[in-house]
Each structure stands twice: as structure tokens, then as C-alpha cells.
């Protein structure tokens, strides 16, 4: 349907190694001008799963319990939004859609004190965002505030007008004498898929070099390059910095 986009939820049988695949199609690349994103999670534990979260309102001060997506491990609590949107599967009532694929990354960047894993962030964003850009902002700001409890991820964000692709990984923790991580959060880069193009990702970081002054088409963590330098992973002026190769 024109200007509406389609979610193609593909559940595949378990393979020897878990894998996810996302296919992203911009408006100009589809016959009827629809944005389309497919998300395949090759996991027997999620086969046939279709999440439903009804629209709701909450009293001020309500807290949201966070449990890791999949294992169900309790991670902590964050303030609940006063208003949330309907969510079915990986899409909400405003046709904001989020998919993912996991690529792991550096073990030393794991924050054992973090509260928000990627799965929880996906569904929190779907409950709160009206656009793909807003979902990116919510995802990254919450990760910075409460800590990112997952490994490296590629995330698809879409709405009826735009499709975005983001690579993200947690920052290397720095614990003070009280055991508090003073360097929580994540570093990330998000690229808008140009209209008329398609893209895909499957368990591999894909964003290499990226434009630094094009906010309509590229968003990124302000410390993505400086963090790599601090960790001894990059030397340079930033012009040749590649997220995926670092």
C-alpha cells in the first residue's frame, strides 16, 4: 500500500549457529513507494513469536523492570514513559520498525553493571518513538544513561519515509573504587539508506568511513573516534576512521 511499509517477519528453523538477516528497502526502490524491512531471527526459541504490547498510560514515577531479551535475566529498572504506543511484532502503531543482527565484538567492552540490553532497547523504542530518527535518539540516549548490556549489534530503523542502519557497541568500562562504571554507554554510527536503494546486514558490522557533517544522512556518537583512540584502536585525524574495521 502506497506510503505504508511492510514488515516481513521471517522465522527460520534453528541452524548450527544462530544468525539474523535484515533486508532494507527504501521508498524509491519499491514498486509502490513503500518502505520494507525483513527481519529473520534463526532461533528456535523465537520461532513463531509475535509480541503484542498495548498502548498504555502510566502514573508519573512508575518504573519499568528490565529483563534481558531471551534469557529473561533481571538487569534493573528505569523510569517508565507516561504514554506508550501499540506494538505488534517489531512494529508500532506509527509504523516505526526495528530489526537487528548480532556481530559480537570486543569482550573487554562488556559492561557487567549495565541495565539495558539491545532487545529491551528495541521494544522500549517501539513503545515510545513516532519516527525512525526518534527511535535512534531514544535507543542511544538510554544506552548512555543506563549502560549498554549487549555486544556489538547492527540495528535497522524504519518508518514510512526513511530507513536507517546503525552499528553499535558498548564502550570499554572504567570502574572507580566503588565499582561504578564511569564510562558507561555505547559508541555508534547510523546511516540513512538513500532513497532508491536497498541494503542488508547479517551478523557483521558494515559501516566503515562515514560523513561527519551530514546530519540528514548520518548520525553518530560524539565520542566514537576519541573512544577508539583512548582504547589504542585508532591513530589519525578521523578522516579515515572506519567503525567496522576498528
Where in the sequence are the language-model features?
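Sec-dependent signal peptide recognition
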Residues: 2-10
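Generic detector of short alpha-helix boundary/capping microenvironments
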Residues: 7-8, 83, 123
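N-terminal signal peptide c-region/cleavage motif recognized by signal peptidases
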Residues: 14-16
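A contiguous strand-loop segment
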Residues: 20-118, 138-246
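Second-shell loop/turn segments in exported
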Residues: 110-112, 120-129
Amino acid at each position: 500500500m502506497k506510503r505504508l511499509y511492510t514488515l516481513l517477519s521471517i522465522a527460520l528453523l534453528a541452524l548450527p549457529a544462530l544468525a539474523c538477516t535484515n533486508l532494507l528497502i527504501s521508498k524509491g526502490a519499491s514498486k509502490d513507494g513503500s518502505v520494507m524491512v525483513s527481519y529473520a531471527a534463526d532461533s528456535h526459541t523465537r520461532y513463531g513469536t509475535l509480541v503484542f504490547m498495548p498502548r498504555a498510560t502510566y502514573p508519573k514515577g512508575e518504573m519499568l523492570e528490565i529483563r534481558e531479551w531471551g534469557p529473561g535475566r533481571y538487569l534493573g529498572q528505569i523510569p517508565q514513559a507516561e504514554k506508550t504506543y501499540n506494538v505488534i511484532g517489531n512494529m508500532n502503531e506509527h509504523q516505526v520498525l526495528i530489526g537487528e543482527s548480532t556481530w559480537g565484538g570486543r569482550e573487554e567492552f562488556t559492561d557487567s553493571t549495565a541495565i539495558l540490553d539491545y532487545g529491551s532497547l528495541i521494544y522500549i523504542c517501539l513503545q515510545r518513538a513516532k519516527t525512525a530518527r526518534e527511535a535512534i535518539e531514544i535507543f542511544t540516549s538510554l544506552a548512555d544513561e543506563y549502560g549498554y548490556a549487549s555486544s556489538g549489534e547492527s540495528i535497522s530503523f524504519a518508518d514510512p519515509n526513511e530507513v536507517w542502519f546503525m552499528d553499535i557497541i558498548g564502550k570499554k568500562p572504567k570502574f572507580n573504587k566503588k565499582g561504578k562504571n564511569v564510562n558507561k554507554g555505547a559508541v555508534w554510527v547510523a546511516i540513512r539508506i538513500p532513497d532508491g536503494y536497498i541494503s542488508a546486514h547479517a551478523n557483521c558490522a558494515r559501516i566503515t568511513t562515514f560523513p561527519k557533517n551530514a546530519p540528514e544522512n548520518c548520525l553518530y556518537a560524539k565520542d566514537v573516534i576519541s573512544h577508539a583512540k583512548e582504547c589504542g584502536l585508532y591513530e589519525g585525524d578521523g578522516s579515515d576512521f572506519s567503525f567496522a574495521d576498528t
